[in-house]
């Protein structure tokens, strides 16, 4: 059993996850390595769900990069060197004090 599993939040739709990803890319595009904000570009769902840090995540592509958005909208990750790196809560210690 996973003590961190979110049980009170519904699974959100792919469309909702895409909106969160669009905003997250808009807020963090330089951090991901883009030379300009691609959030208005096409973001496409890859018809795939992966597990990252114990959470089911929808997989999306945008301007040559791959992202994973937790179905509970609890986190956004981007694929970097074969691993998913957190794009939300990545520069904070909020969860680890």
Name the predicted role of every residue range.
Residues 37-76:
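Exposed beta-strand-loop-beta-strand "reactive/processing" segments of non-cytosolic proteins
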Residues 1-6, 17, 21, 50-52, ...:
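Extended hydrophobic/Leu-rich segments
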Residues 3-44:
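Short, non-transmembrane alpha-helical segments in secretory-pathway proteins
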Residues 1, 67-97:
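A short, surface-exposed interaction/processing loop segment used at functional sites
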Residues 33, 47-48, 82, 91:
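Short, flexible coil/linker elements and helix-boundary hinge sites characteristic
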